[in-house]
Amino acid sequence: MEGTTPGTPQAYEDYEETVSYEDAVTRVGYDESAVERWAVEPDKRPGRTAFQRDRARVLHSSALRRLAGKTQVVTPGTRSRAWDASPRTRLTHSLECAQVGRELGAALGCDPDLVEAACLSHDLGHPPFGHNGEQALNEFAEDCGGFEGNAQSLRLLARIEPKRFVRSEGSGELVSVGLNLTRAALDAATKYPWPRRAHPTDPTSPKFGVYEDDRPVFDWIRKGAPGHRTCFEAQVMDWADDVAYSVHDVEDGLHAGHIDPNCLHAEPERQAVFAVAIGRYVPADTDPAELAEALDRLLDQEWWPHGYDGSAVAQARLKDATSQLIGRFCLAAEGATRAAYGSGRLTRYAAELVVPRAARLECAVLKAVADWYVMQRAEQERLRADQRVVVAELAEALTARAPEGLDPQFWALFDEAADDRARKRVIVDQIASLTDVAARSLHARLTGHL
């Protein structure tokens, strides 16, 4: 359970006891710093690489399991036969992202276990009710550093998820270091390597990857990293995420009957989709004609589903279309990246993932299709409004009554918090950890809204 003081570099000799330098590092293109851990710990079993251990730790984490109860596109149990029978959740999305990322990463020379660990980790910090809950929590947390799902993922991996504890040099008390993943794994899971309001090109961007009180581990992760660049494995994870959710959200929309593929030939429908794409998924100055060309390229494919009736044959054709799309997007990135960097192993900061503009536009159009036909339905907006109320009222109730209502883990952290700002962050951590059902249940118990 215990290790050494956080931030102490792990001597490679400790790691070398179980895996040779040649096998663990040189063979896969990673140096000693990549396999260092925030806190030194002994290896348990010979024959496992550091990144295999990272992947296993994320796979067995309670944070990953909780994603089964968190919204992906539509909340499970909303009277859609398709979603009620087999709803896609944050967990299934993460597993699909991991499969896509692992294969693309391996094709480009990354360690596949490292990329898979990053893909499994990328949504761990998302709160109940998806981006809707994220917005409500960010409003509540405005005066204690805000809330961002990616920053929360890092906080979970490095502090909250109970796996490893070390003795503090100052007080001698046990301090959590989370899953104590390698530097490379934490870096690969860091999609936005900058703090709040420090976006390298857009200071107004709400995206960031670290809270101020998590800066010590973040600075350790980024030691030697060039500026705000994301590592190559994080770029692979990011594209795998885009590919997985753009393709599968459309698949779910077709399966549930919310998307009629024939509508995509009608000009008013197309313009509505392009407006969503320009508003959310592509630069604002993108020419709609480019989006029209991207959509037409997809519609012209022989495997594109031009109808869907739910029959076994239709389901098989739809599944083939999803496979074709995933392959199309991954091969485009693989081919363009290889053309730019050659056939060697591409790892860490040795390269940038090259995704052709055509592939990015096609992916963006798919996101916009799912957004327009699924997420922007009137009943979904009513549901989202109710979800925002649940999160806001739950935050107020916990603020007034904490530590009552907190899980034992967060109760202890609340008692140890130094000031109101720190106590508020604990409440945010508690709410972010809840599943959709658990959030509603706790809200009902604390507010009496049964």
From Swiss-Prot:
<keyword id="KW-0378">Hydrolase</keyword>
<dbReference type="InterPro" id="IPR023023">
    <property type="entry name" value="dNTPase_2"/>
</dbReference>
<dbReference type="InterPro" id="IPR026875">
    <property type="entry name" value="PHydrolase_assoc_dom"/>
</dbReference>
<dbReference type="GO" id="GO:0006203">
    <property type="term" value="P:dGTP catabolic process"/>
</dbReference>
<dbReference type="InterPro" id="IPR006261">
    <property type="entry name" value="dGTPase"/>
</dbReference>
<dbReference type="Pfam" id="PF01966">
    <property type="entry name" value="HD"/>
</dbReference>
<dbReference type="InterPro" id="IPR050135">
    <property type="entry name" value="dGTPase-like"/>
</dbReference>
<dbReference type="InterPro" id="IPR006674">
    <property type="entry name" value="HD_domain"/>
</dbReference>
<dbReference type="GO" id="GO:0008832">
    <property type="term" value="F:dGTPase activity"/>
</dbReference>
<protein>
    <recommendedName>
        <fullName>Deoxyguanosinetriphosphate triphosphohydrolase-like protein</fullName>
    </recommendedName>
</protein>
<comment type="similarity">
    <text>Belongs to the dGTPase family. Type 2 subfamily.</text>
</comment>
<dbReference type="Pfam" id="PF13286">
    <property type="entry name" value="HD_assoc"/>
</dbReference>
<feature type="domain" description="HD">
    <location>
        <begin position="90"/>
        <end position="246"/>
    </location>
</feature>
<dbReference type="InterPro" id="IPR003607">
    <property type="entry name" value="HD/PDEase_dom"/>
</dbReference>
